[in-house]
């Protein structure tokens, strides 16, 4: 039984190893979302620790979540779906599903913690970028930034504050754990 469990675990890593970080970076070269994707990847790695998952696996999902952004910009209902097609067989189905579910316009509802964590990380990255948040930051700075961002993007409050509250996460701590910047 233990051997079967280890084989199953190794199979999961082999699927995830279907694409290396270097290859993912090459796929993203020239993308308007290159730096955003790196930030989302780092946030996902930090979040993985809160949910007892493998940081590199969640980081890869964050890194590749907007791979099709430039291609699907005029057709947001396809955003995420095209990435899932490109990466089919190279990432686990759960990862591809999270990528499809991260944008509400795709029609794929988030159901797993990975789905919801990617939405959180994507929205938190947008908040950090738009509000030019630097680390270390305080809870006050972060909540002021959320308030400012919600004027143009009202969904940020639910996707960031709502998720953090439901999961018992301190947003400012997550931001500070991504490192200086």
Residue ranges and their predicted role:
Residues 1-5:
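Hydrophobic alpha-helical membrane-insertion segments
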Residues 154-159:
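C-terminal binding/interaction regions
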Residues 164-181:
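Charged phosphate-binding loop/patch that engages nucleotide di/tri-phosphates or the phosphate backbone
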Residues 6-75:
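Acidic/His-rich, divalent-metal-binding segments that scaffold phosphate/diphosphate chemistry
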Residues 33, 110-113, 167, 171:
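Residue-level recognition of alpha-helical structural elements
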Residues 26, 51-153:
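Divalent metal-dependent catalytic cores for phosphoryl transfer on phosphate-bearing substrates
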Residues 13, 47, 86, 162-163, ...:
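Residues within well-ordered alpha helices
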């Amino acid at each position: 039984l233990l051997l079967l469990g280890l084989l199953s675990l190794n199979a999961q890593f082999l699927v995830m190893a279907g694409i290396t970080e270097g290859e993912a970076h090459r796929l993203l070269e020239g993308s308007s979302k290159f730096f955003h994707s790196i930030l989302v990847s780092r946030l996902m790695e930090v979040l993985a620790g809160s949910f007892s998952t493998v940081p590199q696996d969640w980081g890869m999902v964050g890194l590749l979540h907007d791979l099709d952004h430039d291609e699907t910009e005029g057709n947001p209902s396809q955003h995420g779906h095209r990435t899932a097609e490109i990466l089919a067989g190279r990432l686990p189905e759960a990862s591809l599903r999270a990528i499809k579910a991260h944008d509400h316009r795709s029609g794929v509802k988030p159901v797993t913690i990975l789905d919801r964590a990617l939405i959180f990380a994507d929205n938190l990255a947008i908040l950090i970028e738009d509000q030019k948040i630097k680390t270390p930051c305080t809870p006050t700075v972060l909540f002021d930034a959320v308030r400012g961002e919600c004027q143009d993007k009202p969904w940020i409050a639910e996707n960031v504050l709502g998720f953090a509250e439901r999961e018992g996460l301190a947003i400012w701590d997550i931001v500070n754990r991504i490192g200086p910047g």
